[in-house]
């Protein structure tokens, strides 16, 4: 047979994208986000979007250690403070206004959590990097004032990560789930009975039904409703008031949306992703009291900048602990 007569594999539209959308996700309702705010013309590893009670935005830059403050509505960006700990990955706000900063440390055993006042002063350890071996990435508060955090350690064949609960008095740490390949994002359902966890290096979404104590898994209550596809994997997540879950896909320049049972119902794309831009989408968050979702991403690989993008979501965001 002449070589010109052989069957030919050819790219379909979109399949030569740097980050092609898997076939099983191509029929999902899809929107492309709009630019909302440029944080830097440099590629910074933005993370940890969180709003204070005044409606202003805080976020962190992991590798440089800067905690940014964005005054709204004028969107003025300032440096609030520099983390004295290595690789801060998330900022959460207590209802009394204190800032809780999770840091990854050396990515092996020196992560922890410290708290500061609203101006970034008076640092105090909550989870010390001296007496523990966590690599702490994301937290979420419950209504009692305790919080869950993800342990970002391990990789696909070394299951060292997990999720832990810190009591409201910050005196005890209880394991909830363990043996994960880089636990990353964590979110609570509106009734606080379901815990969502993303497992980056295994490309899995965990749905955990909790008993009243908040740490015991209900009988048959731990499941994996979704397996993600592609490199790298699921990152931080948040919920809306309809209990939909929004999961940033790191390395893919998009956010996937799931209903409260874990079925995919939509997706949000970063502009330029097919050409390899803004693939480091890390964290979604809602502007308080609205259905406007913002997502941070950066373009380090292409010597590009660091941006926050925005869309209208399915429902208004859920009011988290700092607004209680």
UniProtKB/Swiss-Prot annotation:
Binds 2 Ca(2+) ions per subunit. Ca(2+) 2 binds at residues 109, 111, 129, 132, 134. Ca(2+) 1 binds at residues 47, 137, 184, 235-236. Pfam families: SGL (PF08450). Its cofactor is Ca(2+). Keywords: Calcium, Cytoplasm, Hydrolase, Metal-binding. Its EC number is 3.1.1.-. Exhibits lactonase activity. Acts in cells with perturbed membrane integrity and is possibly related to the membrane homeostasis. This is Lactonase drp35. It comes from Staphylococcus saprophyticus subsp. saprophyticus (strain ATCC 15305 / DSM 20229 / NCIMB 8711 / NCTC 7292 / S-41). The gene is drp35.
């Amino acid at each position: 047979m002449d070589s010109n007569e052989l069957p030919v594999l050819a790219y379909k539209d979109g399949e030569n994208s740097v980050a092609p959308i898997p076939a099983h996700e191509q029929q999902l309702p899809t929107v492309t986000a709009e630019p909302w705010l440029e944080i830097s013309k440099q590629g910074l590893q933005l993370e940890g979007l969180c709003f204070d009670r005044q409606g202003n935005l805080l976020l962190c830059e992991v590798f440089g250690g800067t905690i940014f403050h964005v005054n709204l509505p004028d969107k003025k960006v300032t440096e609030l403070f520099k983390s004295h700990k290595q690789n801060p990955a998330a900022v959460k706000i207590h209802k009394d206004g204190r800032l809780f900063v999770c840091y990854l440390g050396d990515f092996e055993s020196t992560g922890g959590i410290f708290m500061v006042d609203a101006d970034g002063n008076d640092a105090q350890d909550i989870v010390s990097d001296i007496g523990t071996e966590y690599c702490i990435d994301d937290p979420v508060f419950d209504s009692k004032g305790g919080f869950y955090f993800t342990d970002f350690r391990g990789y696909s064949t070394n299951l060292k990560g997990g999720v832990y609960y810190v009591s409201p008095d910050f005196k005890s740490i209880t394991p909830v789930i363990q043996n994960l390949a880089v636990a990353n994002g964590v979110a609570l359902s509106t009734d606080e009975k379901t815990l969502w966890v993303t497992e980056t290096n295994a490309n899995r979404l965990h749905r955990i039904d909790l008993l009243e104590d908040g740490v015991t898994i209900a009988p048959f209550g731990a499941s994996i409703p979704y397996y993600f596809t592609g490199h790298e994997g699921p990152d931080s997540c948040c919920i809306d008031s309809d209990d939909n879950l929004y999961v940033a896909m790191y390395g893919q320049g998009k956010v996937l949306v799931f209903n409260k049972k874990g079925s995919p119902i939509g997706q949000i794309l970063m502009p330029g992703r097919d050409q390899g831009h803004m693939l480091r989408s890390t964290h979604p968050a809602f502007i308080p009291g609205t259905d406007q979702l913002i997502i941070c991403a950066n373009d380090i690989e292409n010597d590009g900048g660091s941006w926050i993008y925005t869309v209208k979501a399915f429902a208004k965001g859920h009011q988290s602990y700092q607004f209680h």
